[in-house]
Amino acid sequence: YVTFDTYLQDFDVLNRNKRYYDGDNVWGCIKNDMRIQSLLQSNGWFGEFEHPVPMTVSEKLSPERIKNVPPEKRAFKIMNPRIEGNKLAATIQSAQGEVGEGFGKEVVAGWIAQFSARAIAVMTNRNGKPYVMMKQLITYDSPWFPSHEVAHQTSSPKATFKPFIESVKSGLNDVKTAVEAAVIPLKEILTNIGHSDPSTQLILESFDL
């Protein structure tokens, strides 16, 4: 598997879609959410390679799908989230399975991994500035086009080769290390998921979903 450090987003900075995020709000959603804390303790806070989106106009995402990362969709795990200045940083480790291997190979091939919040939130006006206030942070996914300019990989990937033993046979994950710079444009999407509170929305920070 491949491990690297990243920024997930920044705070109190106007993003490319003219919105702000509050650091205390986001950090509180991480520290005070029993689900996220449990997932972090078990190394099980996973994200997907792109946000979950309907594949047809008529298709709708269920609340269960929005709030969960199915095992077959796991691309990476988020570890050691931390505040660094006005940014949320974390360590990323590629997941096992086909999707995780694909994610890791893209990073090895030179793609700079990008990250984007998946959250239930409300929009508020703070001294004339539009702030996204999270009610529940679900995870961070890795789209091609995130909305926060800083939300990208910040270190070269480190490959870990771990023995896999089955009966009397053993093998190693085939992972190489390399990284090149890239600049990714971004855009933010708000998709209403039909909560009783019309101001409550699903935040998916991605481009042209």
Label for each model-derived stretch:
Residues 1-167:
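Signature of dsDNA virion morphogenesis modules
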